[in-house]
Amino acid sequence: MANPHQIYRHDAAWDRQVFRSLATSLILHGHIKTTLDRAKRLRSVVEKIITKAKKNDLAARRQILSFLYAQKTKAGIKVMPYLFNKVAPRYQERNGGYTRIVRIPSRLGDNSKMAIIELV
């Protein structure tokens, strides 16, 4: 039987790139629509990032910067200041559970299970 926890058959670099992109988008936009399996894996990535951001020290900033894409959105919002000034203070009193996964109907093309992952 195949390993049920091994979701993707790609190499580690591909996984890292996809989850860097998804995590950056989730932090900037507050919610994204993706497949259910990706949402479940993304949850642990984002929870660790927000927990590190709550510390708000130089080491935490460098660790997060090494993972997230330091990009601007079309509205001109940068990821790092937004994470440390808006997102992390919102969860200062919360001990985990920063994200919510909501299942939505399957995708029409290939019937993949879809979900919306959002920051609580």
Curated annotation (Swiss-Prot):
Is the keyword Repeat in the record? no
Write one Pfam family the protein is assigned to.
Ribosomal_L17
- A GO MF label: structural constituent of ribosome
What's any GO biological process attached to this entry? translation
Any single GO CC term annotated in Swiss-Prot or TrEMBL for this entry: cytosolic large ribosomal subunit
Listed InterPro entries: Ribosomal_bL17 (IPR000456), Ribosomal_bL17_CS (IPR047859), Ribosomal_bL17_sf (IPR036373)
Q: Which residues form a coiled coil?
A: none
Protein name in the entry? Large ribosomal subunit protein bL17
What organism, scientifically named, is this protein from? Mesomycoplasma hyopneumoniae (strain 232) (Mycoplasma hyopneumoniae)
- Taxon lineage: Bacteria, Bacillati, Mycoplasmatota, Mycoplasmoidales, Metamycoplasmataceae
